[in-house]
């Protein structure tokens, strides 16, 4: 687990870490972009110190909380919009991309049991929000794997927008 400071704000910590990184910081974003967006708005020079963001979120063609919205983006669509308009390179590993890396329960158990032991049932419950038949789709795991080995997936460039006007397409 990461060390969480006892006081202060996440956006200040993001800024300090990025400014201190000699080659800039790559951010692995596993939930809503709220703290990163606040950091970008509070510290405009920060964007020059972030090499890129890998976002476990979004989707192409289907959603999990609404027909077209994925949870991480939906929970703070405005923050995601700030991130996407920041000029920082963003690599999105959404539901549709993570579905290609879906794992069976046995594969998950084999990978996770040495790490979490007796906590495995709870860990599986918390991690496996999405299922495709007997396979588990875990965007966070797919994003982390791609961060460690970009050759693990085929990528493409797209222009992405986030709907924030409260329509059915919100998020």
Please provide the spans of the model-predicted regions.
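Active-site histidine-anchored catalytic micro-motif
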Residues: 1-105
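Conformational coupling and interaction surfaces
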Residues: 74-78, 86, 90-171
């Amino acid at each position: 687990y990461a060390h969480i400071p006892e006081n202060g704000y996440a956006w200040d910590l993001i800024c300090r870490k990025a400014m201190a990184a000699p080659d800039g910081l790559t951010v692995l974003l596993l939930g809503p972009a709220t703290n990163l967006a606040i950091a970008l708005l509070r510290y405009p020079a920060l964007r020059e110190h972030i090499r890129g963001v890998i976002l476990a979120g979004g989707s192409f063609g289907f959603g999990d909380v609404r027909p077209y919205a994925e949870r991480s983006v939906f929970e703070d669509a405005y923050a995601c919009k700030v991130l996407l308009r920041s000029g920082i390179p963003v690599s999105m590993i959404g539901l549709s991309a993570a579905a290609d890396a879906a794992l069976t329960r046995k594969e998950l158990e084999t990978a996770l049991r040495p790490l979490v032991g007796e906590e495995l049932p709870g860990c599986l419950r918390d991690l496996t929000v999405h299922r495709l038949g007997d396979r588990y789709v875990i965007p966070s795991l797919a994003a982390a794997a791609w961060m460690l080995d970009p050759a693990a997936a085929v990528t493409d460039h797209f222009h992405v927008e986030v709907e924030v006007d409260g329509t059915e397409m919100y998020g």
